[in-house]
Each structure stands twice: as C-alpha cells, then as structure tokens.
C-alpha cells in the first residue's frame, strides 16, 4: 500500500512514528510537510523563544516539503493556507490511501475533498473531545451534522485514546472502522535502567531539593491556558504542612510573572529550568515525585506519557485528555477539577500521604503507559490499512 501523510511541519513527537511506519512490510510511506523551519531555530510564541529540537526529524522515512500559499483574506495566518502543489503531488503519486490527522485547517479540507472526490481511502486521527466545552444551539447542531457526514466518509478512524473513540462513536462512527493508534512517546527514552532510590536522591541533590519532602514538577509552555498559576495557589495552602519543592521546566510569556508569584510563596526550593529538549528531560522527571498538569485545555498531554514512562505519578486536571486513559486513583495519580486550587491542593496532599506510606509502584505506572507506545500506534495503522485493503478488494 502507498500511504500519503500530510502534516504542517516536522515534530519530535511524530517523526519517530513515521520512521517506524516506514519499516512496515508492504507499506510505501511518503510524508508531505508544508513548513520546513519550525523547530529549527525559529521563534515559538508559546515558549517565547527560538526553539531548535535536538533530535533528527527527517531521517528514516521519505518526505517532501511543498509550498503553501496564503489565503487572500488571511495573508498573515501561517496555518490558514492553500496548497495547489500538494494536491498535484497527491494526484501524481498514485496513493492507495491518504492520512490527514484533523479537520481544523484549510489545507486539511483541500486534502479531505481531494480524497473524497477521487475515491481514495481517507484515514484520520483527530484530537476529538469536548472537555471544558459547552455545546448548544444551532452551532452545535451544525457541528454534529458536519461530523456525522465527515466520519461517514472516513475509511479508518485512528483514535488516540478513550475520549476520541467515544466522540467518534457518538457521531455515528462505525466500530469496525475504529483502530487504536495512541499518542505516544519513546517510552524507553525515559526508563532509566537500574533505577534506584539512591539515584533519585542524587538527582534531587543535583537540583537542590535534598531538604524537600515532596518535589512537584511542571513541564510545558508557560501560557495562560496551561494554568500554571493554579499550582501557586495550591501550594500556598500546603506550605505549612509539607516542605514542597517545585521544578518548572519550560518557558513562555508568563515566565516573569510566574517567577514573581512563586518567589512570594516561600517554597522550600524553587527551580525554573527553562526550555529543555526531550533528550534532556529524563533527569527532571526522575528528580520529581509527581508531575502536575493543571491545564484548562489539553486534548491529550504527552507530558503525562513522559512522566509515567519515567515511573512517577501524575496529578492532572479533568481537562487533560490523557488522564481518562492513564490515571488510576492511588495507582498512577489523581484527577482534580480544572481551575479549582482547593481540589489540586487536596490531590497533592494525597500524593504526599501515599509517599509517606506504601507509595506508588514505579513498575505499575510504567506498565500502565506501556500500551501507549509507538509500536502500538504502528499496529493500529497496520490494522487500518489491512481493513481498508480488504474492503477495497
């Protein structure tokens, strides 16, 4: 089977999947990218700095960059583009199927309509959930009708997790067309071999947390929708009960304000580590006792995968999509109500109580996330391709 994949730009999370797919027997894969320089020294507004990923994103699979053209009524909207060159490449490529992850961009719709018009099987893998969204009225009715139509045209729905599958089925999707292809990271990258408590204590000392009873970790952009200031509100309620250390890995426009806010609390230890590449993250995860993900909007949240691959529990808001797949109370972490600092404080305190008692099982946490792997995603793609091939034969 010849499979075309359309993506906006290379990323450290998707390139490993494409490399793995390129090794599948009987599959000829080609990835089309619209933008070349993102993640290669270009300014990222979310991190508020220039970002260069330190992993090779373009080896191990066939790819080609195509040139998008701005829409005349949105000349400065980078991702709102049309791309006649891409459509020509899809026409001449003689592809058996096309993978277009979502449906939110103009370019997505050019690809979707091209596939439908030419009777080419269409695969999709959207971040489909309604967390934190109240849908009602005519717009919701139109959205429902639209998704009913769209999913009826999709040949294979690759779901990243439970919420995406439930959303697909609620919109009239067929069970037989749904295949599990989870969002995943390279779990092995975060699993330190021969890990011991002595190693953890050594890492804590390295970052200055040796006097802390509980070390919290946040990893990600410092922007409003991530809700990082909620951690400040929560730990203020706990600082007289627990000697808390906080490690923040990431950057963004809110960094200066957050530094001032956390400094005023008087934590046992506070470290802003700035942006770190994925290859450097393992030590930060292993130095921490728990990852906190307080987002107001988070369709999945791959930092949850990274933390659990490292063997540490996660406290995540109920707006984090991966929480509904990966978090088991008292086993892999806790879920709290988004925006509620009292709820977050309670869950952090429960983590501390668990740590004082039997603690969380590192091996259980790692086993839980082991099914959310690149290999499992490849199996999902392979099953979808087998299904589509059998349907068309």
Language-model regions, residue ranges each:
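Short hydrophobic beta-strand element within catalytic cores of glycosyltransferases
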Residues: 313-317
């Amino acid at each position: 089977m010849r499979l075309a994949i359309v993506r906006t730009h290379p990323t450290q999370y998707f390139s490993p999947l494409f490399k793995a797919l390129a090794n599948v027997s009987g599959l000829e894969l080609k990835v089309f990218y619209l933008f070349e320089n993102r993640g290669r020294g270009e300014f990222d507004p979310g991190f508020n700095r220039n970002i260069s990923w330190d992993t090779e994103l373009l080896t191990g699979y066939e790819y080609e960059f195509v040139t998008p053209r701005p829409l005349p009524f949105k000349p400065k909207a980078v991702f709102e583009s049309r791309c006649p060159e891409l459509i020509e490449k899809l026409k001449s490529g003689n592809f058996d199927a096309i993978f277009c992850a979502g449906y939110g961009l103009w370019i997505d719709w050019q690809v979707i309509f091209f596939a439908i018009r030419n009777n080419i099987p269409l695969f999709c893998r959207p971040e489909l959930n309604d967390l934190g969204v109240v849908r009602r009225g005519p717009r919701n009715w139109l959205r429902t009708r639209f998704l009913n139509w769209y999913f009826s045209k999709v040949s294979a729905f690759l779901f990243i997790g439970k919420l995406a599958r439930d959303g697909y089925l609620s919109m009239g999707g067929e069970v037989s067309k749904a295949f599990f292809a989870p969002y995943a990271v390279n779990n092995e990258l975060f699993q330190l071999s021969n890990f011991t408590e002595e190693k953890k204590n050594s890492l804590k000392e390295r970052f200055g947390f040796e006097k802390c009873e509980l070390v919290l970790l946040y990893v990600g952009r410092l922007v409003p929708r991530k809700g990082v200031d909620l951690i400040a509100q929560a730990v203020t309620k706990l600082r007289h009960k627990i000697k808390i250390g906080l490690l923040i890995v990431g950057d963004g426009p809110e960094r200066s304000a957050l530094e001032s806010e956390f400094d005023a609390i008087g934590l046992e230890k506070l470290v802003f580590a700035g942006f770190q590449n994925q290859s450097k993250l393992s030590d930060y995860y292993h130095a921490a006792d728990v990852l906190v993900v307080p987002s107001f909007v988070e369709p999945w949240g791959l930092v949850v995968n990274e933390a659990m691959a490292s063997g540490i529990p996660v406290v995540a808001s109920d707006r984090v999509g991966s929480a509904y797949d990966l978090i088991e109370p008292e086993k892999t972490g806790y879920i709290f109500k988004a925006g509620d600092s009292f709820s977050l404080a309670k869950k952090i305190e429960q983590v501390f109580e668990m740590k004082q008692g039997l603690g969380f099982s590192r091996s259980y946490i790692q086993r839980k996330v082991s099914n959310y792997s690149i290999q499992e995603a490849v199996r999902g793609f392979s099953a979808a391709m087998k299904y589509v091939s059998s349907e068309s034969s």
